[in-house]
Amino acid sequence: MKKIIVIGSGFAGISAASFMARAGWDVTVLEKHAMAGGRARKFEEQGFSFDMGPSWYWMPDVFERYFNSFGKSVGDYYKLRRLDPSYRVWWPGEPMDIPAGYDQLKALFESLEKGAAGKLDEFLKEAAYKYDVGINKLVQKPGRSLTEFIDTDLAKGLLKLDVFTSMKKHVGKFFTDPRLRQLMEFPVLFLGALPEKIPALYSLMNYADIKLGTWYPDAGMHEVVRGMQHLAEELGVRFEFNKDVQQLEIENGTIKKVWVKEQGENESLSAYTADVVIGAADYHFIETKLLPAAYRSYNELYWEKRVMAPSCLIYYVGINKKLNNILHHNLFFDTDFEEHGKEIYQTKTWPVDPLFYVCATSVTDDSVAPAGHENLFFLVPIAAGLEGDTETLRDEYFEKLLIRFEKQTGEQIKNSIVFKRSYAVSDFVDDYNAFKGNAYGLANTLTQTAILKPSLKSKKVKNLFFTGQLTVPGPGVPPSLISGEVVAREIVKEFKN
């Protein structure tokens, strides 16, 4: 039986491990931390349970298809509920709830702009086509050769995919009300560029948002990780935790040993052997820190020229009261959307008056906070690579967010805070070896799509492959599941003999 080692147990790592086990390989996952999940880990403190990273469950069909691939379903591992309203947007003057029901949403659009209900139908008809082609075809490509894209259906539909039109221009064709425009542009904010730089192909995200809905796995997003880990273990995958990979030892262009430090008191070094290694940790870290220079596919200049999706400034907050005026997901769009976008992607500076997001899972789920309490997750998108990430700076931002949160919601929480922990650029570097402290990976710009992304196979090491948000298909939880499947498919194809 061929042996494979997967470095890292985020969504992509567990996915790749599971597909390799299904193909009959002996699979070991080496994880630096004490639990699986990568950015989707969780922690518990004072009776509060916090998801550390992803908080939006979109594209439920991708998760269902993943479990179906192994003869299972989502319901075998965790329970989902659809949120209605999907989320609340706080404009400068008033909040707006985004209903899950399509007819109600159309009525909302029409109330803001005459004719917008019909325009939404047209917009989503196009977005549905993009979603179908994007999820079923484009993201399934390994991005190793242009010939992969010689596909009659793709060629016929190239214009309909709007690859060469910007998201901003595309949205502007349908809607004039600034609130509607902002609402339709917001899902691409985390893809790594301003709406004027992101291809309108990604209006497929609006289809995911509006038609497929916003869901919540009971007990939080880490339940998805637990479910995937459970399935992987049923398939025979072994998970080894507190194993920090230090070096990949190469002989004649092949990895012969994976050197690992045991986290803990002894911190002893041990060697693992495998026929193939999958890097599901940070691509840049594996290339520049684990490989000898002669075996790196990309130099530092290459990485410096990459456009990164954002990092984040996060606060995990527990309060000793219940709130009446917030939903599960809350988007605070009470400041200048475009200015904040420029601070993330153009000037790359600490934002002056940023948009922010608050997730309150305890509004939906009593199990994540003590009785009579709320757990709040504040998130500010910021540029990757920012310096000066000090406790003082974090405290200053938190004070700003608190003032705006209290003003908009009419809820006083400052004196009710019983727990607070912050997380930012330096933590992403320390915990995940994240290049420039990125949170979401490589930006999905046109010049960083498909074959223009870092390759899922090393160009210089015969048995080293990659998966995750710095390679195909790109950032986000559903794409990470697909990334694991795509790399496994390539390995099985290459090593079938």
Language-model segments: residues:
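Active-site-proximal substrate-binding core of FAD-dependent oxidoreductases
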Residues: 250, 493-497
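A conserved FAD-binding loop/helix module that cradles the flavin
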Residues: 54, 469-491
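C-terminal segments that line or cap access tunnels to active or ligand-binding sites in enzymes
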Residues: 320-426
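Mid-domain catalytic core of redox enzymes
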Residues: 246-369
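Helical element adjacent to the flavin cofactor pocket in flavoenzyme catalytic cores
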Residues: 204-255, 259-262
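N-terminal glycine-rich phosphate/pyrophosphate-binding loop and immediately adjacent elements
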Residues: 2-132
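Rossmann-like flavin
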Residues: 92-198
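A glycine-rich dinucleotide-binding beta-alpha-beta segment and adjacent secondary-structure elements
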Residues: 177-191, 353-357, 411-473
